[in-house]
């Protein structure tokens, strides 16, 4: 009788545990399509055994069991796969962002209201060819003015579109920083919730853990992170090598906004002092004004070998660049500041191309020479012996591309002689630069095209201008950047800009595709462990239902047997 009644415990435990397993399986099935949900797995173990007598040398131990119990409902994850996935997901975010920005810049360069930017260069060259046939013809002169205005308009439009895109990227940077801070706050709150729930050692905070792990996965796509969980279930996170989620708080990322451009630079407010500025990314160049202000001269240095090509936020900073690109960034000493900054580098290239065309044409219409005064001072002056003049025959001649509010020459008396001294560009005065935004077609020529320097000083047509223009236009003396080894002319320079963008885009796309495939493969491995398979859960449901039915039949048999025994007594 004792064994019979004890068997009720065994059957009862079977019913309870099968029911619990069915509930867990049903919960898995209900969340089969829930993002971030981790499969729950019931683990069953023996209950305590009752020892009937102590074993001796001649007898075995006699024990009777009380059935089984649910020892744990496992929250199945693989920390090694999690770590690998988060790193590769960060790399995917980095290269996908670079590819996206490069593709957009290509679109800006090649299409403007249905017309390729290159057409404006070709049309300007055709206008100069027509002009060379008869430089005194007002129709040809007017064509030069029109095509020059069109060329500058398209240059300025492309440059402006790139600036607008930089502003768009800048807003994306702010949005991502805000999201990172929001994620950090949520992870910190979930840490406290998990600690509170699991402090008794009885329950696992599965829903909170799922939410936290999903947030960490998302965070890994924005920046390089390190996540470490302690024995209490609390996760501490480092972001770009600095403490982000700590024991008592989440350290928010701050943003420094530059005057003029409005560009944001992420930094760590909690460790930044008046003596030391701590940017979030130590491997991305800072805006020049900020770098000078805080005494930090870091440059962009990112490579897979350095394990720092991680995170879409860094890719946005690299793509946007630290400021607006200008022609002077194409020099050997400054090129490192725009290299790999796709928007800023393209701006610098367009500015450099426009400047070289403007300078070449101005130097033909208004050639300069040098004069050394008696006191040893050397001046750059108008070459009056070889320059052309307009129909009015006056000096100095009018340049084609003029700086707004800044004349090309100033008349001076040197050593008792009259000279037209060239007003050179100076670093102290930005308006003195021949650069996009500062330059327009000379308004005097636009108002009266016959003032274009097309005549020799004896009043005859200067047909020699055609050879000078052809030589300047076809001269192959431009490099796309200091690392380029083959020279090109003006039209070839534009082709190299597009080729350079296309090459970088192909590299970024290949890297993006590779990282996407790698991250997907690791995620598939994770899902095999933590994901919910409806087929597998249906199989488990049938198994646990069968176990429930078996336990029910077992209890029925024991009950009938007990009833029969009682009746016989």
Describe the function of each predicted region.
Residues 1-569:
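Structural signature of extracellular appendage/secretion-system components
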């Amino acid at each position: 009788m004792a064994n019979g009644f004890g068997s009720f415990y065994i059957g009862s435990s079977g019913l309870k545990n099968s029911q619990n397993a069915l509930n867990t399986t049903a919960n898995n099935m209900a969340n089969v399509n829930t993002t971030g949900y981790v499969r729950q797995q019931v683990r069953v173990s023996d209950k305590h055994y009752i020892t009937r007598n102590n074993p001796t040398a001649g007898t075995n131990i006699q024990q009777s069991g009380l059935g089984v119990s649910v020892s744990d409902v496992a929250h199945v994850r693989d920390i090694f796969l999690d770590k690998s996935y988060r790193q590769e997901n960060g790399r995917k975010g980095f290269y996908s962002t670079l590819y996206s920005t490069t593709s957009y810049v290509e679109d800006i360069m090649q299409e403007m209201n249905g017309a390729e930017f290159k057409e404006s260069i070709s049309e300007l060259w055709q206008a100069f060819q027509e002009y060379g046939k008869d430089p005194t013809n007002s129709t040809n002169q007017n064509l030069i003015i029109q095509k020059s205005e069109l060329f500058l308009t398209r240059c300025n439009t492309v440059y402006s579109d790139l600036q607008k895109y930089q502003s768009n990227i800048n807003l994306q940077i702010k949005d991502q920083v805000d999201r990172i801070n929001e994620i950090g706050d949520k992870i910190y709150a979930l840490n406290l919730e998990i600690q509170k729930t699991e402090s008794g050692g009885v329950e696992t905070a599965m829903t909170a853990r799922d939410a936290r792990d999903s947030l960490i996965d998302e965070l890994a796509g924005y920046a390089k992170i390190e996540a470490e969980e302690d024995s209490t279930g609390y996760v501490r996170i480092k972001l770009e090598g600095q403490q982000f989620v700590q024991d008592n708080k989440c350290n928010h990322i701050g943003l420094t906004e530059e005057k003029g451009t409005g560009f944001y630079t992420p930094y760590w407010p909690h460790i930044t002092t008046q003596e030391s500025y701590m940017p979030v990314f130590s491997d991305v160049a800072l805006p020049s004004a900020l770098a000078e202000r805080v005494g930090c001269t870091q440059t962009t240095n990112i490579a897979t070998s350095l394990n720092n090509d991680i995170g879409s936020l860094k890719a946005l900073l690299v793509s946007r660049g630290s400021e607006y690109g200008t022609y002077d960034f194409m020099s050997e000493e400054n090129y490192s500041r725009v290299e790999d900054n796709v928007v800023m580098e393209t701006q610098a290239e367009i500015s450099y191309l426009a400047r070289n065309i403007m300078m070449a044409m101005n130097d033909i219409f208004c050639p300069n020479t040098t004069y050394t005064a008696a006191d040893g001072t050397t001046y750059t002056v108008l070459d009056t012996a070889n320059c052309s003049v307009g129909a009015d025959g006056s000096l100095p001649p009018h340049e084609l591309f003029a700086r707004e509010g800044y004349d090309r020459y100033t008349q001076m008396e040197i050593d008792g002689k009259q000279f037209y001294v060239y007003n050179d560009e100076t670093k102290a005065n930005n308006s003195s630069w021949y650069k996009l935004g500062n330059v327009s077609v000379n308004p005097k020529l636009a108002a009266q095209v016959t003032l274009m320097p097309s005549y020799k000083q004896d009043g005859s047509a200067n047909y020699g201008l055609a050879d000078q223009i052809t030589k300047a236009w076809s001269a192959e003396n431009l490099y796309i950047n200091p690392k380029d080894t083959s020279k090109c002319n003006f039209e070839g320079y534009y082709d190299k800009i597009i080729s350079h963008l296309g090459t970088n885009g192909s590299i970024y796309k290949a890297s993006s595709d590779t990282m996407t495939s790698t991250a997907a493969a690791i995620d598939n491995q994770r899902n095999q462990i933590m994901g919910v398979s409806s087929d597998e859960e249906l199989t488990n449901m049938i198994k646990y239902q069968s176990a429930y039915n078996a336990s029910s039949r077992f209890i029925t048999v024991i009950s009938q047997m007990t009833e029969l025994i009682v009746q016989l007594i």
